[in-house]
């Protein structure tokens, strides 16, 4: 992921356009140079922040692996969220924390973590994952309407089947078979043929027929 971000930043450095014509050519070239310099400084600062955030994430993972006190892990997570709220590392750490809280059946805490991710991270994949996990957390609490609302989060087409399938789960839990069948069917239709989730999804469909 870090390598991908660095490649994207390098590409973004070349995305500036200036039309330089007539007697304004020299002035525009100077403005372009200044603008490019400022943009490069901004990008370098962003790259530095991403590296710092990744270091905090690595520290969190290490503490978790070493079974450090939860208070220490939570302190590192808060530091990451406050200092680098829009970084991929902050989103990853918060998703990990949500999973831990879910496993411990602290659903309200997991819910808060996932809502934080949705509010602070705009990456399409992470948005889809957070929305899906939030739907599952709310389903576990039988907050069906809230779960469906979370699963209505706009996502890219590639990730839509994930939310559709979970919507089907919510409807199935309410014994609303027709709605569940509809969402399972739409998810299966949009899911790639080689997806590892197709078999399980087909089983869900068949169980309702």
UniProtKB/Swiss-Prot annotation:
Spans of repeat TPR: 161-194
Subcellular location per the Swiss-Prot or TrEMBL entry: Cell inner membrane
Transmembrane segments: 24-42
GO MF terms, alphabetically ordered: protein-containing complex binding
Main location: membrane
Entry keywords, A to Z: Cell inner membrane, Cell membrane, Chaperone, Membrane, TPR repeat, Transmembrane, Transmembrane helix
Membrane topology value: Single-pass type II membrane protein
Protein name: Ancillary SecYEG translocon subunit
Organism the protein comes from: Neisseria gonorrhoeae (strain ATCC 700825 / FA 1090)
